[in-house]
């Protein structure tokens, strides 16, 4: 097993989210964004100044993407919304599915500007979710019978997508059209983690094609080569890290969200940093997230 590198980073936000998720970074404003899904909150952090804000939401938001300097796309249990960055006003943009018991979970923007977004049951009901492709307002279902969609990310050339169903805990890869982000083949197994500690959660793919994956329940971020070889493990000071994001002026730092979901009082006392947001404390070769293309 790859040796675990001790945590050498810092806490970016002490606000403990029940389910911190969906971090991203807007290089135009130098601002990191993430969600407390179950708390119906959108968190904002200006990295240079340290200025923080928490925006209440009327839904369970999980993924944010920049559209342009004045607009953001948010995925939620009620569909896709456009958020005005100045007024925080929300406008409905598209419906993902007609399943009121579901919510959005993990997702990411492909280099072509399309969105891959996963849905799941609010209580992680078996096979209740799916993974969708969104191009403008056109929604296409890609994969059904997903329990907990996660690890959605794309290779730098846009020709490969990665994803998992955390309930199965197998990291998958699939060839896709770089121009559209639509699959051109069937998913194949990249790494079987079904007998390994923790769950394969959110992931990002760096400029070298390495996959940085948050390992829920294992207090770590793990790094894979495109062939599935695990090459590094970095400790996170919380048991349930949920998703990473590249941040900083050159996307050279790694932010990681976490969660205290499912913990009783004793577990939370033993895990005092659960739900906080961290910087890993290492230099990475990250990539900025593309804008969503309307």
Curated annotation (Swiss-Prot):
InterPro entries: 6-blade_b-propeller_TolB-like, SGL, SMP-30. Binds 1 divalent metal cation per subunit. GO terms for biological process: L-ascorbic acid biosynthetic process. Keywords: Hydrolase, Metal-binding. Signal peptide: none annotated. Gene3D superfamilies: TolB, C-terminal domain. It comes from the Bacteria. Disruption phenotype: Cells lacking this gene exhibit no detectable phenotype when grown on galactose as sole carbon source. A divalent metal cation binds at residues 21, 150, 201. Involved in the degradation of galactose via the DeLey-Doudoroff pathway. Belongs to the SMP-30/CGR1 family. This is Putative sugar lactone lactonase. It comes from Rhizobium meliloti (strain 1021).
């Amino acid at each position: 097993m790859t040796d675990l590198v001790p945590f050498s980073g810092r806490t970016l936000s002490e606000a403990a989210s029940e389910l911190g998720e969906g971090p991203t970074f807007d290089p135009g404003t130098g601002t990191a964004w993430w969600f407390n899904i179950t708390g119906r909150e959108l968190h904002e952090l200006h990295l240079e100044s340290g200025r923080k804000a928490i925006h209440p939401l009327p839904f369970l938001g999980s993924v944010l993407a920049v559209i342009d300097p004045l607009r953001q796309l948010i995925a939620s249990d009620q569909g896709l919304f456009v958020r005005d960055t100045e007024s925080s006003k929300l406008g409905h943009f598209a419906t993902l599915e007609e399943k009121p018991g579901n919510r959005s979970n993990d997702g990411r923007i492909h280099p072509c500007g399309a969105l891959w977004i996963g849905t799941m049951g609010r209580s992680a009901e078996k096979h209740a979710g799916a993974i969708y492709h969104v191009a403008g307002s056109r929604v296409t279902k890609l994969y059904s019978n997903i329990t907990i969609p996660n690890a959605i990310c794309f290779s730098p050339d846009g020709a490969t997508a990665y994803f998992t169903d955390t309930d199965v805990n197998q990291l998958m890869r699939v060839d896709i059209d770089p121009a559209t982000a639509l699959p051109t083949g069937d998913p194949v197994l990249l790494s079987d983690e079904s007998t390994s500690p923790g769950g394969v959660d959110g992931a990002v793919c760096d400029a070298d094609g390495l996959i940085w994956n948050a390992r829920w329940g294992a207090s770590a971020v793990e790094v894979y080569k495109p062939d599935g070889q695990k090459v590094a493990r970095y400790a996170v000071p919380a048991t349930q890290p949920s998703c990473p994001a590249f941040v900083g002026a050159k996307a050279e730092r790694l932010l990681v969200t976490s969660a205290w979901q499912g913990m009783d009082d004793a577990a939370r006392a033993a895990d005092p940093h659960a739900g906080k947001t961290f910087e890993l404390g290492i230099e990475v070769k990250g990539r900025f997230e593309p804008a969503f293309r309307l």
